[in-house]
Amino acid sequence: MRSDVSTTSGIFEANRARGAVRFDVHARDGVTRRGALHESGSLRVRFPSPEGEGLSGVFVNTAGGVAGGDRFDIEISAADRSRLTLTTAAAEKAYRATGPAARLNITLKVGAGAHLSWMPQETILFDRARVQRRFDIDLDEAASLLLCEIVVFGRTAMGERMEQGEFVDHWRLRRGGKLVFAETVRLDGNIGAKLARSAVTKGAAAIGTALIVPGDEALVERIREASDSFAGEVGISAWNGFAMARFCAQDASRLRADMMAVLARTGAALPRLWLN
């Protein structure tokens, strides 16, 4: 019996996707260039032609999605005065899990005078998907950051909703070596019922977050001026030198439109893939 269990476990592990990307960028003569790059497994990053002084990177998951037991690790370092924008080639899909949760670990380090925009396309969680994600962000006090994430609970365009599963999202932000923001979102079990609660999303199928560093009340007021155009619910606040906008909407397209309206008030440049 033990041998059969061990064999089954080994087969499951062997069939799980693994992927890792690690690279750094640096600025020279006002132009951002890529340094050392490491890629392994089914995760890749491609760099389109540079636009101005900044560098853009596009992540590609050749596994075609995320399933239970998969693991992906991303580690990025942006040196002083560099400018980097990161996105994904398509929406990421997390499929039904029959075993342990998929694990996604993202580590970002941004130096003095540098800027990093993390703007992937949405993550779509299928019913009974299991995903555990972690962001560890280390900013110099003089660095700037725009981090945007959209999560959709089910393929809403197909009339599907995520009813059961697991989604755990850890965010840790350090600035100047000090922890200034820590949050863990945990949804598991009967996710459909939890999302229906007024204190959660009031039935909305898509949620989003935009973390803006630096950010202050003046930025919050500029964003609030656009509130009449929002298709969903948007909340914005600022503290500890950064601002955070939270979104919920009935589908990804409405939420993305609201997020783009907010980002327009920050002066952020959107990745071309967001405009397709």
What are these regions (language model features)?
Residues 75, 107, 136, 170, ...:
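Short, surface-exposed charged micro-motifs
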Residues 2, 11-20, 24-40, 103, ...:
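N-terminal intrinsically disordered, cationic/polar leader segments
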Residues 151-276:
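A structural signal for small-residue-enriched, beta-sheet-centric alpha/beta enzyme cores
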Residues 2-122, 127:
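N-terminal, charged/glycine-rich beta-strand/loop interface patches
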Residues 78-80, 88-90, 110-112, 120-122, ...:
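Short, structured patches in soluble enzyme cores that scaffold and shape functional sites
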Residues 83-85, 115-117, 144-146, 208-209, ...:
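Structural motif
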Residues 133:
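Internal active-site segments that recognize and position negatively charged phosphoryl groups
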Residues 43-47, 95-100, 128-130, 156-160, ...:
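A short, polar/proline- and glycine-enriched secondary-structure boundary/capping micro-motif
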